[in-house]
Curated annotation (Swiss-Prot):
Gene that this sequence comes from: ddx1
Chain spans, region Disordered: 78-101, 275-320
GO cellular component assignments: nucleus
SUPFAM superfamilies on file: Concanavalin A-like lectins/glucanases (SSF49899), P-loop containing nucleoside triphosphate hydrolases (SSF52540)
Family: Belongs to the DEAD box helicase family. DDX1 subfamily.
Comp. bias intervals (Gly residues): 87-99
The protein's name: Probable ATP-dependent RNA helicase ddx1
Amino acid sequence: MSAFEDLGVLPEIIKAIEELDWLLPTPIQTEAIPLILGGGDVLAAAETGSGKTGAFALPILQITYETLNKKAEIPIIAPTNTSGEDGTSGGGGGGGGGDTIELDQIDRDKNMAVDGLICQSRSSDWCGIKATKGISSGKFYYESIVRDEGLCRIGFALKKSSRNIGTDKFSWGYGGTGKKSHESKFIDYGKPFGNNDVIGCYINFDEEIIGFTKNGQDFGEAFTFNSKAGIFYPALVLKNAEMEFNFGSKPMKHDLKGYKPINQAELLIDQQTSTQIDNSKNNNNNNNKKGSGNNKKNKGKDDDKMNDEDNNNKQPRKTLSLIIEPTRELADQAYSAILNFSKYLDSPKIQVSLCIGGEKSNGGRNKIEGDIIIGTPGRLESLVKEGSIDLSSIKFFVLDEADQLIDDNLAIVNFIYNKLPIGQNLQVLFFSATLHSTKVIKFCEQITKNPTWVDLKGRDFIPDLITHAYVKADPIKFESLWRNSENPLRIRTDGVHASDVQQFGKLKEPEQKSEAIKLLKAQLLLKCIQSFKMDQAIIFARTRLDCDHIHQFLKDAGGGNTSGLEGEFSSTVLHGGDNISRARKDNLEKFRNGDVRFLICTDVAARGIDIRGLPYMINYTLPESFEDYIHRVGRVGRSDRIGLAISLVAYEQEKVWYHTCRDKGKGCHNTKLTENGGCCIWYDEPQLFTAIQENIGPIELDSDFQLPKDMKQLNFGGSTKLTGASADYKPHTEELRSRVLQLSQLEETIQIDYLTLPKRIIKLK
């Protein structure tokens, strides 16, 4: 019996992962998979390389497959007719015949998310929505339930009103602050309301009054109105809040004497809006016909069988899972992993789409198809805005490397989230190596409901198998390495000091020291490579320009003519900018396959890229935060392999580019500081290094660029199982031996006592 079977994973998926040599689940998989399969939001933090992708991909894949086989509860078939309030047909609530009233998917603000009769907005601006139908006669009533804290205003509005109800003469509202509003006149009325309160809204066309209730308490007349003004629609405006409507499809929390649920009324639509709504329905159906794209493709009998039901009924599959990755490489990795995991899932075959910049998405020409969609933030945002992705049936919303996504693309993530169907069916999953920042926690609180935290590492955890070392880039101490007369091999620097450093002299000026540090770091890089005889390493630099210059420097040092193990300094570059997707992928594969020894990159590669057994990592430039340091060094020390992380730390501050110009550095030569209108800053590596020293205590390499003698036996890149390092555990094992025996005896005694307890009780009686 597989250990994954204990977690509830399908046999077909287990068969696929066993072929990948996944025999035992990692700790993060053991914790997260059952939680996700069981439903609910999950926030998981675990060390880099711990199997986080499998932790969310396996359960997502399983539930998607079960849903397609109609073994799950959520709907996946595109509707072909108007549904009721809860997704069921008919009038509901004992009236209205085939008439139904819903929240209008069209007449809403862009940041208002809708799931059936639940609406939510996490924007700091007011976001409004109206119902699809209204009334013009009778006495009717509806309720709304406040589902979390926030600001909201509820009431009635004409179709021509602003969505910010209560601010014009065509709408009437009652807000959570205990005020009624009409034409932007806010007057005390009733009582304030908040989370879990039930607000009733009633309208009486006979007496021409509008009023409100709170938890059954009637506050009486709030407004008078002209009953001939038109059709009155239920309406709502929110700010960072969530509410649920009940138009009468289920029993009201508090009945109001003399009033009927609004869905029992003669429901009406303004004539000018009916065409728009009908077109919307037609557009949705046309888009959904493409489904997973199988209607257009002939892949043999298996595919024909898989799509028989969909083709016959013309009811295409809808996307169930959306996974956002911060980089192309991570998206591609997750895509490949899910394809591997789903190898034996047939009837139907899971359709997976990859949406990244610079690549054509798998699927139709205008419609992105797939049961699972994986993509990068910018690309997904564009596709959602174009209407190329149907998010109406999303079951899983996954943020992988969530902290980076939130730091760099919060607005995009929020935009996409607000397009999802919120409610009980949506599971939000956060995965990363670090989830402890205030910004991440705040966003989690906004978009998750009672999430389960899985934290297997604590704040800023780093695997024990990584040795941390550093070299101080002191241009005075290592003067012989960078002075022109001593070493003609020089790196081309970034040009920051092209006009203010003509001679170095005795390095009295900060600019002179800064330029000297730039020249020195390249020489220190060579020394470290040669000292440890590095055959494979990732080198992190701060900017694309730095990466390109390091790459050229290594070529000049002898890495340009040969490749792989034959080239001592053979290298390739991985960063953003003009390095297009195909080239980036090729460069990464060259490094993985051993065609080059060194991968030079910016932080674009710091998240999630999996290169097994990588022995070395070099920080040519320190990252801007300790958390980014964690992600960088996480490239080594994986799969029980011993790793070494070396940082080249500037002895003084270094002046570097920090482009605020429109073209982001293209053709820019403005070396003034940013506070003076320029595009440069002083980068304080000594200060950045303080956090690393306090938390880790790295070892300084000696004058020969070596570790202390007692650490020289470490086999970097080698397995802990194959080195003498395992011998260090023998004394500890012997020490624990007696305690384990005692624990075993105690366990045996307790079990015997438990089993004999009934006999002893009988004797006492």
